[in-house]
UniProtKB/Swiss-Prot annotation:
GO cellular component: nucleus
GO biological process, one term: nucleosome assembly
Designated name of the protein: Nucleosome assembly protein 1-like 3
Organism for this UniProt entry: Pongo abelii
Biased composition (Low complexity): 35-74
Keywords: Nucleus
Region called Disordered, residue ranges: 1-99, 161-311
Biased composition (Acidic residues): 161-182
């Protein structure tokens, strides 16, 4: 009996598995479903005929077979509803895309690809060009180094300039234009090799012409002498004709005698005006009240007892004033930054050596101070010097790719980049003081820029900080280091950067 029951249970299970396999291999027409239903009915009849021996076992077998057939049919229906039709052959093809180049004929696309390869070669030439510019900057920075050293010595009272060095170089207090320089240069240039022999021959001819010119002058004088000879003849005829002319002639002779008297009067007039002016000045001095004179005497007596003010050494607060007058750096400098920046003695610019990645570094030199232990604070800007296929306008100029700062070794309680706040918590019923460190706005945040992640993007706030940081590096590189004196005097105003703010296209690109 046990063997018969096992056979009765196993047969409908096998039929159910067969039905599932048939349902999975059916087509969209649904003919296989009909065959599966007919097979299930035959299996039900066979199972009922085989179990006619015992009533209890036959009842259990029929119930199991009917439940198995019902479950498989419901599964096949659900599977049929969820089935997705296969894509057609046209849909299986790779999409051409909506790009303009993808819609071109294959022959034209091949030619465009050849042009792209040529453009890659042009970008390689541009990299060499930018590296050559960097080498030129490094070369001329060495020529400027002795001039920067003299500037450093004057600012820090290590050298006192002479009177000649303190005088303005130009006579008209304006730089001469290029045309004026070109007009003056030929006179200073030595003669060329081919012109040395010709010049001596031309000089005697010029001298001969110069000698001939004064010979003509005496001829003119002879003509002038002949004119007065004719005048007495006319006068003689007039005397013979009438006596009235005789009376008129002596009056003409008297005029030359009066001429020297008129000249003497003209000479005496400026002397008289000068004497009047001097007298007016003397009267003005006499009109000064006696009280003012006494006040001036009292001030002189008071100053005798006080020591004279000593002249400041060097140029105090030079770089502080320079940085405050820079368009982007000025708003960054807070009041608590100014006492620290008064110890700033020099700002220099150094370029990377040949063979190294293209970059330049700013060095901020500080005198010993009670705020931090660093003598030099460094900020390095790395320049993009390799072509990028994502940037088609690589050759437009320098582009800052990344920047690196340095760690400031602050003394205890002197860090101005953070503020410490104390918050009291009363959760346990006791008063506890927990210090919290909060970032603070400061110029010295310039030396700790946000790092650019290798993967992903920066936050919008950090991205804006980097953009502004790169602009500051550009301004320091182009103008401030080379022409710091114009920032100190305030001759460079804010409108200067409205036209050259994005000079060189040095902008951070995501």
């Amino acid at each position: 009996m046990a063997e018969a029951d096992f056979k009765m249970v196993s047969e409908p299970v096998a039929h159910g598995v067969a039905e599932e396999e048939m349902a999975s291999s059916t087509s969209d027409s649904g003919e296989e479903s009909d065959s599966s239903s007919s097979s299930s009915s035959t299996s039900g009849s066979s199972s009922s005929s085989s179990t006619s021996g015992s009533s209890s076992s036959s009842g259990s077998g029929s119930s199991s077979s009917s439940s198995g057939s019902g479950s498989t049919s419901s599964r096949s229906r659900l599977y049929r509803k969820k089935r997705v039709p296969e894509p057609s052959r046209r849909a299986r093809r790779a999409p051409l895309g909506t790009n303009f180049v993808d819609r071109l004929p294959q022959a034209v696309r091949n030619r465009v690809q050849a042009l792209r390869n040529i453009q890659d070669e042009c970008d390689k030439v541009d990299t060499l060009f930018l590296k050559a510019i960097h080498d030129l900057e490094r070369k001329y920075a060495e020529l400027n180094k002795p001039l920067y050293d003299r500037r450093f010595q004057i600012i820090n009272a290590e050298y006192e300039p002479t009177e000649e060095e303190c005088e303005w170089n130009s006579e008209d207090e304006e730089f001469s234009s290029d045309e004026e320089v070109q007009d003056n240069t030929p006179s200073e240039m030595p003669p060329l090799e081919g012109e040395e022999e010709e010049n001596p021959k031309e000089n005697p001819e010029v001298k001969a012409e110069e000698k001939e010119v004064p010979k003509e002058i005496p001829e003119v004088k002879d003509e002038e002498k002949e004119v007065p000879k004719e005048i007495p003849q006319v006068k003689a005829e007039e005397k013979a004709d009438s006596k009235d002319c005789m009376e008129a002639t002596p009056e003409v002779n008297e005029d030359p005698k009066e001429a020297p008297q008129v000249k003497a009067d003209d000479k005496e007039q400026p002397k008289a005006t000068e004497a009047k002016a001097r007298a007016a000045v003397r009267e003005a001095h006499k009109r000064v009240p006696e009280e003012r004179l006494q006040d001036s005497v009292d001030l002189k007596r008071a100053r005798k007892g006080k020591p004279k003010r000593e002249d400041p050494k060097g140029i105090p607060d030079y770089w502080l004033i320079v940085l405050k007058n820079v368009d982007k750096l000025g708003p960054m400098i807070q009041k608590y930054d100014e006492p620290i920046l008064k110890f700033l003695s020099d700002v220099s610019l150094k370029f990377s050596k040949p063979g190294q990645p293209v970059s330049y570094t700013f060095e901020f030199h500080f005198l010993p101070n009670p705020y931090f232990r660093n003598e030099v604070l460094v900020k390095t800007y790395i320049i993009k010097s390799k072509p990028d296929h994502n940037d088609p306008f690589f050759s437009w100029g320098w582009e800052i790719e990344d920047c690196e700062g340095c760690k400031i070794d602050w003394r205890r309680g002197k860090d101005v980049t953070v503020t410490t706040t104390q918050s009291r918590t009363t959760a346990t019923g006791e008063i506890e003081i927990q210090p919290r460190v909060v970032p603070n706005a400061s110029f010295f945040n310039f030396f700790s820029p946000p790092e650019i992640p290798m993967i992903g993007k920066l936050e919008p706030r950090e991205d804006a900080i980097l953009d502004e940081d790169f602009e500051i590096g550009q301004i320091l590189h182009d103008n401030v280091i080379l022409k710091s004196v114009y920032y100190y005097t305030g001759e460079v105003n804010g409108t200067y950067y409205q036209f050259g703010k994005h000079y060189g296209n040095k902008k951070y690109r995501k």
